[in-house]
Amino acid sequence: MAVPFRRTSKTRKRKRRTHYKLAVPGMVKCPECGEMKLAHRVCKECGSYKGQDVLSK
């Protein structure tokens, strides 16, 4: 089984791992109630989407 000839340096290891980060979710303010919600999704607080009430509470 092959093994690395040289030890991987901290810098090289960290450069490779820069792409292993989590993506930040796109949060927007709901125009109806003003609460923060995920973009292109129904608001959990007021149940509206694109100005229409889709979830009745």
From Swiss-Prot:
Q: Which family does it belong to?
A: Belongs to the bacterial ribosomal protein bL32 family.
Organism, scientific name: Halalkalibacterium halodurans (strain ATCC BAA-125 / DSM 18197 / FERM 7344 / JCM 9153 / C-125)
The family database entries (NCBIfam families) matched by this protein are listed as:
rpmF_bact
Q: Give me the Gene Ontology terms describing cellular component.
A: large ribosomal subunit
GO terms, biological process: translation
In the UniProt record, the gene name given for this protein reads rpmF
Q: Which UniProt keywords apply?
A: Ribonucleoprotein, Ribosomal protein
User: GO: which molecular function terms?
Assistant: structural constituent of ribosome
Q: Which InterPro entries match?
A: Ribosomal_bL32 (IPR002677), Ribosomal_bL32_bact (IPR044957), Ribosomal_zn-bd (IPR011332)
Pfam families per the UniProt record, alphabetical: Ribosomal_L32p
Q: Which domain of life is it from?
A: Bacteria
Which named protein is this? Large ribosomal subunit protein bL32
The organism's taxonomic lineage, starting at the top: Bacteria, Bacillati, Bacillota, Bacilli, Bacillales
